[in-house]
Amino acid sequence: MKKKFAVFAVILSSFILFSCSRSGVVISVDENDLFKLNYGSFEDELNMFDISLTGNISTYIAMRDGFFYIANGESKKIMETNSYGDLLSLYYNNESVRNLEFEQEDSSVSTKKSVKYPFNTLGPIAVDSRKYLYVVDTLPQDRFEHDEENRLLLNNVVLMFDVNGQFVNYIGQQGLGGTPFPIIRKIYTTKKNELVVVCTTNEGLLAYWFNNRGALLYRIPVTAEQIPMPADTEEEEGRYYTSVGNVVPDYNENKLYIKVDFYQEMLDSTLKKNSGVTYRKTLLYALNLNNGEYEAPLEIPAYEHTILNDMSKTTDEIPFDFLGVTENGWFFFIITNEDGYIVQMVQPDGQKIFKRSLTVDHSQVFYYTLDLSSSGIVSGLFVLRNYAKVSWWRTDSLLAAYISN
């Protein structure tokens, strides 16, 4: 089924390969703990304030070509490290970070880089193949704007730094220097070094697609009402409800992938009344931005959560979260379970599905943030009681071995 969608275009000048069945045993992928980060105010430490208190934590991670980029909103700085944890670059607000060893080194011989910028509240971060760095920041309150028509507070921008750490400009809704965004959920970069910004609105999600110079190419609203309904839902009793879970850009093409969960209204046959809703299935839609059409959706198997009682067994289906897509077109989905996470990797045509377990002791973790690289490596920053750690799982090796065969 194809459905036209309104796209606003702006024309401007070593694993053993086991195929996991849906109910089979899930094989674990070894976690590689790469390095630790202490808590504190020094340049190579994280400032997490009091991690025992409730509240939002504004710390995010991205990995590119083996280098890690950590946006630590609590200390208003960004750290670039290698896989050993050596600090290579520091972007910082000089009112929050002082007495830097970086500043004391001879810049003519040092390969380290320090960049001053008046960060406010940092958010998600991304890096392209040029090593241009993009990071979400919140404007000072006196620069907030309001979208009265859509009832939105506009206070997020994306800051753009070049390979030398030079601040280029901030990106808003129209491009360089544009109107601030509503709440930004996530940012992505593509093979062509284009930037995709995904925002949350009162109606759903809103994606902005920019070229590698920060000029707006597409503005794409995504709401539940615009999603094509599967043909089989029209033949069943009980109303269907749609929930848009996430929007992720394709790495190579002008496409957006939209994960949609479908729920069905349950009817009591005796009372002829609604008795609740139940999860039915998850579909992944590809929206072609060149022609505004949805391609045929791909059904994504749900996670089966089994509860064993004394004399019975109950199995519930729970939809996965959409983590991202690799440069080879594999779709990654993830869900939390008692042992850590289950990652489900789906081939572009859906013919092959791998499930792997990522073991994490949730009882020791106060906060975490995950990242999927374009090559298929899952990385994570985990905030523990006495320190934070950066780990990765080489799920890319599994895919590479399968593709080579």
What do the PLM-derived regions correspond to, one by one?
Residues 20-405:
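Eukaryotic scaffold repeat domains enriched in small/polar residues
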Residues 1-8:
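Bacterial N-terminal signal peptides that target proteins for export
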Residues 9-17:
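Bacterial N-terminal signal peptides
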